[in-house]
Amino acid sequence: MANFTTENELEDILHQMGHHIHDKNQFATFKNEIDNLLDRELCLSDADEDVMNESLFASLSVDPAAQFIRQERNFPTENLNIQSPIVSRKRQGKRFIYENVELQSDFDDESSNEYPERNLLVDRAWRSIHRAMETCNGATETLKSISLDGSDIQERSSVDDEENIAESVSVGLSTETEQSELQKSSRPEKEVWTRNVLSLEPGRAPKKYDPVTRYHFYKSEWDRHPAPGEMRRLSLRWKVREFMLRHDVPRLNENNEDWKANHDKDWSPRPYID
């Protein structure tokens, strides 16, 4: 068995790939496997053609030597006639219709027969792009329908508001307050501070927040449900006071002088001590 690589070359290649083999026996086994693989490939190859020198991109028609390899291997070209990937888009109402258009190819028959894989790869690429465009168009149509529904609801609510205002002016202040309360209760609270986006763009939300309306809504809720303040702290103080008064406080005897400190050092500010 011939040695195709040395240990230093193989170790450098492993180091470049990010692998490290510290065990010598394991490294020797790995080198023997690599030599066996290369020897097997050399035996399977022909005398005039070396498999190891063959390009990896020959099957993708990227390498210039691909046409010579296909001619030598007699590639079948009869079953590789593919459909034209060119697609036309026509508008029908709110939707688009895609149709395949058969156009005259810019390449002659000889070039198409020489590169059949190229047409196959281009067709696959165009089909994947076509599926991606259909997905994007479906998403945009959904967003447009949502925005149209939201605008219709907003127009209906504005018309209802005008009718309610006219009725309240004709009837009186009492009916106006009742209608405003009913109107507030009928609207969902989660959509009070949201408004529809006028110019809808793909990938953007169909609605956005109105900070002024949201602030007034929160302010009204805060006024209705104020945070606990002095009453909670006062109850906590009473609990602490009750806990401290469970034990009797020791009384101080004025005649007892044990608590006074005896200073051995003669302090200079004597009046301060007296």
Swiss-Prot record:
One of its GO terms (cellular component) is cytoplasm. Disruption phenotype: Embryos do not show centriole duplication defects, are viable, and develop into fertile adults, but only 10% of the normal number of ciliated neurons are observed. Interacts with sas-4; leading to its localization into newly forming centrioles. Residues 156-188, 255-274 are annotated as: Disordered. Pfam families: HYLS1_C. This is Centriolar and ciliogenesis-associated protein hyls-1. Belongs to the HYLS1 family.
